[in-house]
Amino acid sequence: MAFSPKESMASRRQALGLSALGLTSAFGLVACGSSADNASSSASATPSEKPKYAGKVSVVPENEATEHNPTHPATVTGEEGTTLKSVKLVNDTTGAELKGTLSDDKITWTSSEDLEFDTQYTLTYTAIDSQKVEGKGESTFGTVTAANQADAWIPNVQEGGVYGVAQILEFHFSEPVVNKDAIEKLISVTGKGVGEGKIRWYSDTVARWRTEDYLPARTAITAKANILGVDLGNGMIGNSNLVVNFSTSDKRYALADNNTKTMQMFVNDKLVNTVPITLGNEDWPSVVGKLVVIEQEATYKFDPTTLGLKKGDPHWYEPFTAHNTSRLTNSGVFVHQALPSAYAYVGVGNVSHGCLGMMPADAQYFFDTFDVGDIVETVNTGYPMADPDNGYGDWNIPFASYSDENYKGDW
């Protein structure tokens, strides 16, 4: 049977359509068959694991460290190819984040802001190992507590004070100083014309400083003890630097001579007054040597019991209030106005218990002219010197022997 052209075209389209469908299906089956094979292959293989962080980081202070010296920075350091991405150091008390610096090679981070004493800190970091895998870490530590801190101060010199040129600088420490040589290097006294000084230790907590000659007159002076963060010994850490600024007055010197029963007063090496005095009696002779005015009071109550005297003792005297007093020793040697009962002996004989007594006008003159830190030297009493720590008898020690704690003078 023959086909018409119209039918023939339609039949061809149908045949081509079926043929195309068959090809598509065939490709589809092939594709489906290939996917199935891959799925089966993947199912039978071991799945790949995510790389683990293998970096190495060292932290100072170590985790949970205590009594860390706050003057020493906290550091984080990457090792064996590990670098640092970020570091954060936080004060646990205030929540404040401390500043720090990351090295250019990103290996080391160092805190650049001062830590505080007796404070807990938390340090966190993100690091990257040699395989570029990130990891995180955390460390906590505490700084030196109050029980292990040490202070320094100068009790006999106040900030902004004015003192005589013979003033001794006495450094006190709240804890025993074991590392004396190291601490001495941290003590300085500076000012125009101030000479080289030496230090003498009177105990593990008290050290005095002086020069060979007196301090220069009318000079601004700064005394320091830079002990912040320094171990004084036994793990006691200095918690601050000591700085005291003061100045000196005119050079004032007094010479009390038992032979003449007089006191000569000098200001800037010029004699300004000579006055009669009474000194200590035979049983209580005045000590000789150079002593420094420790303190001054317009009035001061004298009590014989402080000398170990009791009523009935031949040296007993009734307590009295002295005027225009300048203390020279801790044990009770003063320059002061004599009692009316002693006026007749001033310039003639000795009736005191070691003090230097004057007539009222002369005592007033001394009190108004002299000040703390000025020098008073007594001679020709036939009695030894006062111990150097009974007041400030340091000027009686030869400068060459001043640092020798075993040196024993005439006291």
Can you name each region flagged by the protein language model?
Residues M236-A344:
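Gly/Pro-biased beta-strand-loop elements
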Residues V165, V288, P304-W411:
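Exported/periplasmic cell-wall-interacting domains
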Residues S86, L186, T262, T325, ...:
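Conserved beta-strand and immediately adjacent loop positions that scaffold enzyme active sites
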Residues A2-A20, G28, G33-D250, I277:
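Acidic, low-complexity Ser/Thr/Gly/Pro-rich repeat segments typical of extracellular/periplasmic
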Residues H172, P176, K180, T299, ...:
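Structured segments of extracytoplasmic/periplasmic soluble domains
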Residues S203, A207, L255-N258, P285, ...:
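Short, glycine/acidic-rich beta->alpha junctions
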Residues E170, E184, T260, T274, ...:
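Extracytoplasmic/secreted envelope proteins and their assembly/folding machinery
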